[in-house]
Amino acid sequence: MKIFITGSSGFIGLHLSQKLLNNGHIVHGFDSMNNYYDVKLKKSRYQILKNFKKFSFTKGKVENQKILNKSILRFKPKVIIHLAAQAGVRYSIKKPRTYIDSNIIGTYNIIESAKKSKVKHLLIASSSSVYGANKNIPFKEVDKADTQLSIYAATKKSTESLAHSYSSLWKLPITILRFFTVYGPWGRPDMAYFKFTKKILARKKIDIYNKGKMYRDYTYIDDIVDGINKLLNKTPSLYQKKKIKNDSLSPVAPFRILNIGNTRKVYLLDFINTLEKMIGLKAKKNYMPMQKGDVKMTLSNTSLLKKITGYNPKTNYQKGIKLFLKWYMQYYKIKKIKI
């Protein structure tokens, strides 16, 4: 099957592209390779994908409708997976316009191109951050999501609404993927676990917000990719015969929202403690107040995804951290830790 992936040189994009290529699919990647974080890391990811015969690539921004549309219409995919986005909750407070352009305009362009090319299924990456100040734990797809706390979260929720409108008007099958704190090898350097690792190794202080009184649903990259892969052929339909309890399927469109998470809460200090033990160094901790735009807790309910696909996350955070550290030490050529 021909699959078009935006953000192919990103963290999730790399792992997903590899999985699909190994499964025999034909993948066309699309990425701007911007400098929000280390471009060298993005290029290294691209070099891995470049070795696959069934992989092709276009460099471009999703905000550029002309390049994007040309690339999609030429490739003629059956499925589009839209992962490209300007990430980062804190950066969105400083540079909101960047998020409007990349996340909202970029997603609009993707949906327009998907409509023109008549794809069978469009999957759009969203985020657990859209749940915002929601107090219903664990988060279910049918919960209200009207209290976003950051510009990043607001742009993600906006794209969900835009996608639903298009799906309703043109009967375009769309699945929204709400990811929960993704981590693992080849991850993003702006993510907390990545920063913690770098600073612990450098014997520098790590900033811990809200005095560590928060938890996350840390989801290992392989589980995220497994969830997406299982959904490729699970196209939402207005004519679904069997009703599913707490289904987020729209009553007026072939549109569904799905959480992809680990379903286990991990307290921040426990995560840091595991990092310390595996690295063999104690972190120097700098306790800080809660940051603007951040949330104290995230936890997914993935019952709907399990009913539809049989999804069952396999990697606990201890194993996930171990796998991440193994990659980190190899990639950054850290041979020995001196205590």
Regions found by a protein language model. Give the residues of each.
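Residue-level recognition of oxygen-bearing side chains
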Residues: 67, 98, 105, 144, ...
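A glycine/serine/threonine-rich, flexible loop-to-helix segment
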Residues: 137-138, 189-197
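Hydrophobic alpha-helix immediately C-terminal to the catalytic Tyr-X-X-X-Lys motif of short-chain
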Residues: 158, 162, 166, 196, ...
